[in-house]
Amino acid sequence: MAHPNEDLIREGIAAFGRGDMDAVRKQMADDIRWHVPGRGLISGDYEGAEQVMQAFARLAELTGGTYSAELHDVLANDEHAVALYTARAERAGKQLTDNTVLTYHIRDGKVSEVWGLSTDLYAVDEFFS
């Protein structure tokens, strides 16, 4: 039986993949913080659910809706979850394939903070430059 926080993250990533942004939003604490490393157009620290949702909309805009996350695994306990996935996208004739790790902090059944880690940040920065 999976940990409830594993289910939470798996459901969120599946909802993101379906474009069900209402379901994605419902998983977030209102005061969520989301950290995207690098220097590209989507890099930065997003404070609050509204800013995070705007960042997701910007990601879809920049990639023409091609961004996808192929989930490999989720590891979870009572306070954290870690998702391992491969991100893929196309933009301006460029293609991105990047193995990514998201580290989630979970509070009261909601995602309260996320740290993204990329295996090839140079490629991600170039893609989103």
Indicate residue ranges for each PLM-predicted region.
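Short, low-complexity N-terminal intrinsically disordered segments enriched in polar/charged residues
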Residues: M1-D30, F128-S129
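A short hydrophobic beta-strand element
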Residues: D78-A87
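A solvent-exposed, acidic/Ser-Thr-rich amphipathic alpha-helical stretch
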Residues: K26-D78
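Short, surface-exposed coil-to-beta transition loops
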Residues: Y67-A69, L96-L102
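Short beta-strand segments enriched in hydrophobic/aromatic residues
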Residues: M28, A87-A89, L102, S118
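Short, cysteine-centered beta-strand-loop-beta hairpins and adjacent loop/turn segments enriched
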Residues: A89-T97
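Short beta-strand edge/turn micro-motifs at domain boundaries
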Residues: T103-D125
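Ligand-binding pocket scaffold of soluble enzyme catalytic domains
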Residues: F16, G65, A92, E113
